[in-house]
From Swiss-Prot:
Protein's organism: Ectopseudomonas mendocina (Pseudomonas mendocina)
Region (Disordered) location: 1-22
Keywords assigned by UniProt, alphabetized: Ribonucleoprotein, Ribosomal protein
UniProt name for this protein: Large ribosomal subunit protein bL32
GO terms for cellular component: ribonucleoprotein complex; ribosome
Biased composition (Low complexity): 13-22
Superkingdom assignment: Bacteria
Lineage: Bacteria, Pseudomonadati, Pseudomonadota, Gammaproteobacteria, Pseudomonadales
UniProt record similarity statement: Belongs to the bacterial ribosomal protein bL32 family.
């Protein structure tokens, strides 16, 4: 999730919890 978030902000929505780590 974190890796995708760095690639695109839109991906952070999918990650969700992953985004919380960052």
């Amino acid at each position: 999730c974190v890796q995708q978030n760095k690639k695109s902000r839109s991906a952070r929505d999918m990650x969700x919890s992953x985004d919380a780590l960052e």
